[in-house]
């Protein structure tokens, strides 16, 4: 059983009670909500004549279903208009802070909260979204929850959970030039399998993790859930503190020094005991691309589609289905796979640093004639920064469509969808069957830099060929 890890410390600090059956009642320090998983939860409160327990601990924005092409109200999509109108009314009724379109603070919830300084070390954070683990990059313990638990947090500010085991993933050495956090996390998930993290929290550590920027760390923690882990986190350090400092919601003046001292006390240390430790050599990672229908089905750009015997046992159960759906055969190179659509965005890779690196790859290039390409900033703030730096012009001149903030083609709840059997090069987090809107659409996950390279060539390409020129 783990002891004295950051996870253990934060868990004990937020444990309200031991519950029958072995679970714990955990206080949630920050609750993030959006338009899709909150309406039923608010409806349940109304049915029981309950109010939100701590409105000041809940923050709302709109992201999942918002259109990214035309955000004038009322939306052309009646369902989007209805869902966002409902969230507006619920937040007004319960006095919840709401960052709506046009506020300058709207965007994907897992992009907005960190950039506002809402996400801080030592917090417990919950949201009705699978990728809430993103916030673990700051040394918080962050969980995705279902609608019934959204209701519970609104009503009591607590949830019932079984304590997780803690696995440390120690990433040795450093990533080479042209290799990014997305490549590393896809490599880790492939190495361990998509079910390896069930019942675990993942602590990411080691020289390769320390070398990452905060936005790259968010990419790592964001995809913890894709490896089966309930959450993933990184111990806070000077990079963490520097990122948070002077944000809108960060501690100020004398409270800042107190916060730093407390945050440092939470770090795992040489006395920490983990349930399991896995070592990854980051220097061996190359640009990585998924070939199948789980994020664990990935290979390096120089590799070929694996045979069944070469696939992690946790992923073999779905390999045959992946071969058939994706149209790949064992031994086929992933490089030069033709692409139809390119998407840069999502809570995994829709931040300003992601747009910068993709724009650097694009340079003065134009996208291939057969390619339809989208770039969707993760928030209004990201969009503003990108425009100030001229990044939007780089994308538009290359042939990309520049869109407004939202989840967009990551899950295709709006009109941003694949059509028919189109193949997508995507910087998002899931490549499940039909994930990007078409029942037969196929998704290849990769870094934003790799998406940019694919857009130029019209096929899966090694981004290092562009960076080394």
From Swiss-Prot:
State if Metal-binding is listed as a keyword: yes
Identify the metabolic or biological route this protein is part of: Amino-acid biosynthesis; L-leucine biosynthesis; L-leucine from 3-methyl-2-oxobutanoate: step 2/4
Q: Which InterPro entries match?
A: 3-IsopropMal_deHydase_lsu, Acnase/IPM_dHydase_lsu_aba_1/3, Acoase/IPM_deHydtase_lsu_aba, Aconitase_4Fe-4S_BS, Aconitase_4Fe-4S_dom, IPM_dehydratase_rel_enz, IPMI_cat
Query: What are its E.C. numbers?
Result: 4.2.1.33
What is one Gene Ontology biological process annotated in the Swiss-Prot or TrEMBL record? Answer: L-leucine biosynthetic process
- Residues at which [4Fe-4S] cluster binds: 347, 407, 410
The residue ranges crossing the membrane are none
What UniProt keywords are attached to this protein's entry? 4Fe-4S, Amino-acid biosynthesis, Branched-chain amino acid biosynthesis, Iron, Iron-sulfur, Leucine biosynthesis, Lyase, Metal-binding
- What does the cofactor field's note say? Binds 1 [4Fe-4S] cluster per subunit.
* UniProt GO molecular function: 3-isopropylmalate dehydratase activity; 4 iron, 4 sulfur cluster binding; metal ion binding
Q: Which family does it belong to?
A: Belongs to the aconitase/IPM isomerase family. LeuC type 1 subfamily.
Q: How does it assemble?
A: Heterodimer of LeuC and LeuD.
Q: What is this protein called?
A: 3-isopropylmalate dehydratase large subunit
* Species this chain originates from: Prochlorococcus marinus (strain MIT 9515)
């Amino acid at each position: 059983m783990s002891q004295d890890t950051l996870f253990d410390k934060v868990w004990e600090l937020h444990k309200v009670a031991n519950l029958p059956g072995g679970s714990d009642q955990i206080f949630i320090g920050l609750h993030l909500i959006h338009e899709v998983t909150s309406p039923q939860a608010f409806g349940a409160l109304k049915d029981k004549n309950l109010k939100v327990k701590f409105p000041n601990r809940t923050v709302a924005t709109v992201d999942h279903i918002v259109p990214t092409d035309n955000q004038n109200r009322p939306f052309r999509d009646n369902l989007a208009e209805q869902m966002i109108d409902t969230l507006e009314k619920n937040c007004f009724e319960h006095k919840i802070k709401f960052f709506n379109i046009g506020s300058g603070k709207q965007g994907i919830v897992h992009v907005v909260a960190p950039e506002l300084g809402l996400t801080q070390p030592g917090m417990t954070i919950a949201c009705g979204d699978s990728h809430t683990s993103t916030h673990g990059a700051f040394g918080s313990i962050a969980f995705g929850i279902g609608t019934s638990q959204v209701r519970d947090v609104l009503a009591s500010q607590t949830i019932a959970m079984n304590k997780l085991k803690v696995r440390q993933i120690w990433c040795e050495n450093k990533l080479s030039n042209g290799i990014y956090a997305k490549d590393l996390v896809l490599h880790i998930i492939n190495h361990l399998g998509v079910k390896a993290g069930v019942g675990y929290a993942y602590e990411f550590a080691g020289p390769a993790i320390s070398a990452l920027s905060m936005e790259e760390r968010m990419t790592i923690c964001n995809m913890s859930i894709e490896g089966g882990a309930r959450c993933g986190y990184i111990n806070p350090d000077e990079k963490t503190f520097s990122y948070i400092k002077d944000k809108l919601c960060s501690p100020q003046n004398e409270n800042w020094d107190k916060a730093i001292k407390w945050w440092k006390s939470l770090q795992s240390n040489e006395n920490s005991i983990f349930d399991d430790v896995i070592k990854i050599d980051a220097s061996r990672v190359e640009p990585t691309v998924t070939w199948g229908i789980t994020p664990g089905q990935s290979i390096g750009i120089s590799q070929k589609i694996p045979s069944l015997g070469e696939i992690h046992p946790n992923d073999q159960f779905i390999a045959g289905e992946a071969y058939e759906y994706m149209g790949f055969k064992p031994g086929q190179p992933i490089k030069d796979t033709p692409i139809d659509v390119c998407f840069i965005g999502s809570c995994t890779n829709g931040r300003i640093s992601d747009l910068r690196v993709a724009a650097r790859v694009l340079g003065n290039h134009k996208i291939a004639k057969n390619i339809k390409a989208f770039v969707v900033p993760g928030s209004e703030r990201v969009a503003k920064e990108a425009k100030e730096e001229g990044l939007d012009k780089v994308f538009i001149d290359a042939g990309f469509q520049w869109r407004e903030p939202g989840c967009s083609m990551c899950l295709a709840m709006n009109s941003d969808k694949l059509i028919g059997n189109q193949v997508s090069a995507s910087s998002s987090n899931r490549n499940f069957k039909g994930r990007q809107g078409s029942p037969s659409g196929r998704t290849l996950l990769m870094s934003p830099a790799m998406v940019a390279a694919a857009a130029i060539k019209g096929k899966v390409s090694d981004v290092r060929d562009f960076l080394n020129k």
